[in-house]
Amino acid sequence: FFSMIPKIATGIASLVKNL
C-alpha cells in the first residue's frame, strides 16, 4: 500500500502542474 503513495502523489502533482 505504502509503495503506491509516491505514485499517487506524483500523479496529483502532475495534475496540479497542468492546471
Swiss-Prot record:
Keywords: Amidation, Amphibian defense peptide, Antibiotic, Antimicrobial, Cytolysis, Fungicide, Hemolysis, Immunity, Innate immunity, Pharmaceutical, Secreted. Its main location: secreted. The modification Leucine amide is found at residue 19. It is found in: Secreted. Phylloseptin-3.1TR is amidated, whereas Phylloseptin-3.3TR is the name given to the non-amidated form. Signal peptide: none annotated. GO terms for cellular component: extracellular region. The keyword Cytoplasm does not apply. Expressed by the skin glands. The keyword Secreted applies. One of its GO terms (biological process) is defense response to fungus. The amidated Phylloseptin-3.1TR has weak antimicrobial activity against Gram-negative bacterium E.coli ATCC 25922 (MIC=100 uM), Gram-positive bacterium S.epidermidis ATCC 12228 (MIC=12.5 uM) and against fungus C.albicans ATCC 24433 (MIC=25 uM). Has an anti-inflammatory effect, since it inhibits the production of the pro-inflammatory cytokines TNF-alpha, and induces the production of the anti-inflammatory cytokine IL-10. Has an activity of stimulation of insulin release, which may protect the species from being eaten by predators by causing fatal hypoglycemia. The non-amidated Phylloseptin-3.3TR has weak antimicrobial activity against fungus C.albicans ATCC 24433 (MIC=100 uM). Not active against Gram-negative bacterium E.coli ATCC 25922 and Gram-positive bacterium S.epidermidis ATCC 12228 at concentrations up to 100 uM. Has an anti-inflammatory effect, since it inhibits the production of the pro-inflammatory cytokines TNF-alpha and IL-1 beta, and induces the production of the anti-inflammatory cytokine IL-10. Belongs to the frog skin active peptide (FSAP) family. Phylloseptin subfamily. This is Phylloseptin-3.1TR.
